[in-house]
Amino acid sequence: MTAPPQWHRFGSRIGDHVLVLAGSQIVDVPEGAELDTGSLGEFLAHGETLGLDNAPDVRPQGISLNVTSACNLGCSYCYADRGRFAGRQQGSMSRGTAAAAIDALLRHCDRKARATVGFLGGEPFLHPALIHEVVAYAGARAADVGQAIGFSVTTNATRLREADHDLIRANRFALTVSVDGGPATHDLLRRNLLGQGSFADVMAGVAPLLATPGQAMVTARATLVSGQLNLAQRYDALRAHGFTRIGFSPVRLGFGALTDDDWPVWTRASIELAERELAELLAGSDTGYDNFTTALRMLHAGASSPFPCGAGGGYASVATDGRWYACHRAIGNADYALGDDLAEVDPQRQQRFLVARHVDRLEPCNSCWARYLCSGGCHQEAPARTDASCQAIRDWLDFCLDAYCALTAARPEWFGDHHGNR
C-alpha cells in the first residue's frame, strides 16, 4: 500500500518550491534537487506536532441560529427548501430557545477566543425582533462572563430596515449578502414569490451599509450554477454596485449543480479573475476577490486541517426547535444531530461525527496532496465529489501557491498590514 504524500512539489513564476502538507509549510528548493524525508526532516517533524491525525476534543466556539423557516424569495437552487429543509423545520425560533442556545455556547466556549453567534434562515430578517433581542441578550451575557463575542448573518437583504442597519453597524456584524451579480444575472434565479426579480430590493436594503458600514464587514456571496460561470463579469458588476468583498460558491448538489464538463470552465474562470487581481496586488493595489484572499491568508497562516470547516467541532447550528446539528445545511438530518438534549452537545456523539469524517479516513482524499487544504470539502457535498471536481480544486490550489510565492517575494507587507503574520 502506497503511503500518502507528505509534500507536494510545485513551480511558481519565481522558482521551485515544496509544500509540506502538515502546517502548509512552503520551502524554496533548488531546481532539480532531489527530495526525501531527510532533506525535509525539520519541516516534517514540525508537522507531526500539529496533531492532524486526531479529531479535536472541542466545544462549539460559534453557533448559528436558524431564526425562521420562512423566506420571501424562491431561489431555484436553494439547498434549504426556502428554510423548511424538506419539512424537517417549520416555524420560527422563540426567544427562549435562542437564549438557551446562547447560554450553552457561553457555558462551554473558550474564554481566550472570540465566540460567534450567526443568524440564518429562511430569511432571518423576516423575524427581525428576535435578532435584535438576541444581540442584546448575548452581548449582556458575554459581558457578564468576560467573553468576547461577535455576530454574523447571511441574508438576501431585501428586508433590511434602518434599525437593522444600525444594529449591524454597531455590533461588528459579518454581513453576507446573497447576490449573484448584476440585475440580469441575479434576477434569473433569485426571484420573489411572485416570480419577479429581486435585485432592486437587494440593493435598496444593502446600499446604506455599503455607503456607511460602520463596524460591519459586508461581503457579497454569488452562487454559481451549471453553464453560468462568468466570474469576472459578475465580480465587476458587483464592484460597480459598491461591494468591496465578493466571493463565489458553486452549486454541487441539486438544481444547477456543476457537471464534470463545468469544472474545467470554473477553474479557468477562477484563475483568470485571480490573475487579474494578482496583477493589481503586485502593482500596489488591493483586491476584493474573497476566495482568492482567503486562500492567500490560509497559506500565510500555515493553515492545515483534516476538516473543511468547524462543523461538528468548533461550530454547531441550532434549529428552530432548539435541537443542535453539526451544520446549518443538515437541519433535521439525524446523521448530523449532536445530541438529544435541546440545550447541550453530546460530546461522545460529537466525537463520533468528527472521527468518521476525518480526511485521512476518506477515499480518495487520504491519498491526495491537497487533503489538508481542501480537507475533503463540505461534508454535505461529499456525495457529489468527482475526479473532475477534485482536479479543479487541485488546479486552483496550485495557482494559489504560485500566486502566494509571487506576492510574498514582491510585496510581503501586504500580509503584515492586512492579514497577520505567519
Feature-to-residue mapping (PLM):
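Short glycine-enriched, charge-decorated loop/helix-capping segments at active-site entrances
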Residues: R84, R88-S92, L188-Q196, A384
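N-terminal [4Fe-4S]-dependent radical SAM core
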Residues: T2-S64
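Canonical Radical SAM [4Fe-4S] cluster-binding loop centered on the CxxxCxxC motif
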Residues: V58, S64-G96
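Radical SAM enzyme [4Fe-4S]-AdoMet core and its adjacent flexible, acidic
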Residues: L188-A200, A207, A211-A311, A334
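C-terminal accessory regions of radical SAM enzymes
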Residues: L19, E280-I331, R361, N366-H379
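Detector for the c-type heme attachment site
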Residues: Y79-R84, Q215, W369-L373, P383
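Radical SAM/AdoMet-radical enzyme domain recognition
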Residues: A98, I102-G118, H127-P250
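Flexible mid-to-C-terminal extensions adjoining Fe-S/redox cofactors in radical SAM and related proteins
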Residues: I14, I331-R422
